[in-house]
Amino acid sequence: MGKLELLQCLTGHRGRAWGAGWHPKGNVLATCGEDKTIRIWAEDASQRWVAKTVLSDGHSRTIRDVAWSPCGQYLASASFDATVAIWDKKSGEFECNATLEGHENEVKSVSWSKSGSLLATCSRDKSVWVWEVAQEDEYECAAVLNTHTQDVKKVEWHPHEDILASASYDNTIKLYKEDLADSDWSSFDTLVSHESTVWSISFDGSGNRLASCSDDQTVKIWQEYKPGNEFGVSCPDNTPVWKCVCTLAGYHSRSVYDISWCKQSGLLATACGDDMVRIFKEVEGSSPHEPTFEMVGSKHAHSQDVNTVEWNPTVVGLLVTTSDDGDVKLWKYEPEE
């Protein structure tokens, strides 16, 4: 087994710590929580992470999620007040320069597309919204997708294409894309296998695979099959299909709330209601179409539910967790020699 070492505990949030988002360069971290604030952390001269800024005037209720744009210039925050705020530092200090309104109640997740020209949000109102970045500080709704039958927990863009995935309380994952002929967004696949709420999803670096985690205490790996694939998987309407190729069961004793697929190492990290963080590695030589994963690390990480886990995009082995206990923790994973 590898080693998960606690590097630092970042304190300051009051109440639950919910979301965490690494800046694309990996040198800045944004976190948010029940205290209606966003904290921006960076390393000081002694390489300790410190809170550089606290943003407290953007939302009137819990902030559930934060995400940096791919260019690193903008930070989006999703709140239970039904809005999404867009922050930037153009003036030298962080300011909220746009507020996206339209959801009927709590916004649970926000995600930027790879190009940075699209933003996705999802809510307890069962809808997924796609927003176009029209011009500076202007965002236009490009689509309202009402395909889920329950609360939508998570949205995540494909790492290379304008394909969007969403996870829901209705136990399914939906995939969406735009019909370029008529600019209409629609769902082209529904991934069904989980037996309870799907809390979170994460694409691998290639975008050909998706990991999901659920209230059913499992993690599932989904593989994309394109039309004309050599595995004989049929693709109706000449559209790629996604199939569950692996289920990780028996590792988690409570709901699995978040999952992060490291784009550099290929390692999976999970955040669980049993207060644990676990690391999984694909077994070398296993078939991508029937992969096997093994647990290569685990840690009792917090004193309450772990809400978020996210690998740093540039520093291999560095990850952040947030918890109901109010703490944000930084960890270093060292594989077994």
Curated annotation (Swiss-Prot):
First and last residues of every WD repeat: 12-51, 58-97, 102-141, 147-186, 193-232, 251-290, 301-337
One cellular component (GO) term of this entry: cytosolic [4Fe-4S] assembly targeting complex
Origin: domain of life: Eukaryota
GO biological process: iron-sulfur cluster assembly; protein maturation
Xref: SMART domains: WD40 (SM00320)
SUPFAM superfamilies: WD40 repeat-like (SSF50978)
A Pfam family assignment: WD40
InterPro entries: CIAO1/Cia1, G-protein_beta_WD-40_rep, WD40/YVTN_repeat-like_dom_sf, WD40_repeat_CS, WD40_repeat_dom_sf, WD40_rpt
Keyword terms of this UniProt record: Repeat, WD repeat
Family: Belongs to the WD repeat CIA1 family.
Function: Essential component of the cytosolic iron-sulfur (Fe/S) protein assembly machinery. Required for the maturation of extramitochondrial Fe/S proteins.
Protein name: Probable cytosolic iron-sulfur protein assembly protein Ciao1
Originating species: Aedes aegypti (Yellowfever mosquito)
